[in-house]
Amino acid sequence: MTQLKIFLISLAVFFIPFIIPGFRNVNSLIIQSEDTVPSIFTTISIIKDQTLYLDKYYVMMRDRYPHPDDKDFQKDLTPFYLRKIDGHYITAFPIVTSIISIPVFILPVIFNMPLTWDNLALLGHLSGALIMALAGLFMFKTLREGFDLEEKKSKILTAVFLFATVNFAMLSQAMWQHGTLQLLSILGIYFFLKHQKNPNAYINMLFSGLFFGFAFLSRPTAGLPILLIELYLIFTNLHKIDNLFKSATTFTSGLFIAASFFFWYNSVFYYDIQNQGYSDQLFGSWLSPFPVSFLGVWLSPSKGILIFSPVFIFSIYGLYLAVKNKIDKAGLYKIFAVIILLHTLVISLWKHWYGGWSFGYRMSGDVLPYFIFLMIPYINSVYFEKTKKLFFVLFGLSVFIEIYGLLFFDGIWHAAYDLGFENTSWLWSIKDSQFLFDIRRVLVKLGLMASACPKCL
């Protein structure tokens, strides 16, 4: 019953504001990013046309969301979120989110729902909310059953995961790949921990590998946890060679099933792995001004992890306690910390480490479950009782920031200040930060200021 309540409450909190007219009057952005547009149409195409090709919907997508360099359609550039292969248009992004969203779309599509942008946004929003609500449900199950955390504390950390992070303002609001990756990664960890408790139940390692494999198909950044979890498995089972061999084999078998699916649809629809959307970014997109970009991932006034979710300070403290006190699963907590560190390091090297036109630290959303897991040593310690007030203050502040993002993220701040990846000084300005810009927007509406962007006049 508790799990059902968590699922239903989170789904309602994520989805209901979108259908309230008053909310739409405050934030009229119905689809957060064109990155999520092909996922919507891929789901429709799978159901309606039994294909991944988006030829029927290309004009509709291009007219609403053209390539940034082709706004007048004079060059007819294929939008960056699509690929043109052998005369067919296909999504440039992974398709796992589209597949998971089929249950949401199937009845409206079968009954010929009109393909208007409002209808599509509604279904896309419901899909994003549903995926994140499921992620919250399995986060709670993992905390309770995998880490043996008591119910009250599991609810607190699940609430942090759902509402004090970009999961609230961003990833639950559209068909982002990040939400799918989180759901599948949590399931991978859940079954891995079940195997740790019952080493002879190798089916759990098969499921762990399967879910981690599909997480990787959702976003390539999920490859880091796979490698590190496997290394942890090896080094903690060297004294049990037979068990280690069977565990590693079943885990790898799960990965193989996911890989087989990828190679099948890649050969049928993409023909060559080089036609996959991320392939052309593999060698030419590592252009960030490191280490400034790495500091930006964590501390940028308009994008930093610790700025938008200051409650994560307790994740860092949790790691410290795990290492200092050598608690149960201390090695696993170290692995979680390395996953976060390597992910933020890799992202900081990529030219769009700040996530393009998005709210907060979207690009680091992939590792949010590991931030939550690192809070376990803290919330289980005597220091939680001593610092409980500070924890809930930062928790509340983090939730407030997400509600603010839900209301104010509409791309206007980016339109006013975004200088692209070649000059990232705009990401460090406090005076022109997204927070202060939006305060000025409110003052303009109240007639107390002439413009929210004085330099734009």
Sequence positions of predicted segments:
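Start-transfer (signal-anchor) and selected internal transmembrane alpha helices
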Residues: 1-24, 31, 124, 144-145, ...
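Short helix- or helix-capping micro-motifs
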Residues: 13-14, 154-165, 190, 212-216, ...
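Transmembrane-helix signature of polytopic, membrane-embedded enzymes
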Residues: 113-118, 136-164, 183, 199-203, ...
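Transmembrane-helix motifs of polytopic, lipid-linked glycan transferases
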Residues: 122-148, 186-191
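Specific aromatic-rich, kink-prone transmembrane helix
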Residues: 180-198, 203-212, 226-232, 370-374
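Perimembrane helix-loop-helix junctions
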Residues: 197, 224-256, 316-329, 373
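Membrane-lumen/periplasm interface segments of specific transmembrane helices
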Residues: 228, 245-320, 335-347, 368, ...
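Hydrophobic, aromatic-rich transmembrane alpha-helices
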Residues: 234, 307-330, 334-337, 371-378, ...
